[in-house]
């Protein structure tokens, strides 16, 4: 499992997209950690997650976890994903 870190406030960059395509090409399970979730507010998180999913053309087997190091939002989900390794 690979953890790909993106900024939830922005669309994934070309490099983010390229890295995700590389991981999918080699069938590597991936979790997207969308950081800085505290900067946009909880009500906007689903909208930003949808943008990331669409831009990356996210596989149904992969997951996006909104995360904030400031508020610890999403920390349990990240720990759970690490535990699954």
Segments the model singles out, each with a brief description of its role:
Residues 22-26, 58:
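Conserved catalytic network of the ASCE P-loop NTPase/AAA+ motor domain
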Residues 11-14, 21, 70, 76-77:
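Glutamate identity and glutamate-enriched acidic tracts
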Residues 14-21, 47-51:
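Charged helix-capping and loop-helix junction motifs
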Residues 38-85:
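Canonical P-loop GTPase G-domain recognition
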Residues 1-17, 27-32, 37-44:
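Conserved Switch II/interswitch segment of TRAFAC-class P-loop GTPases
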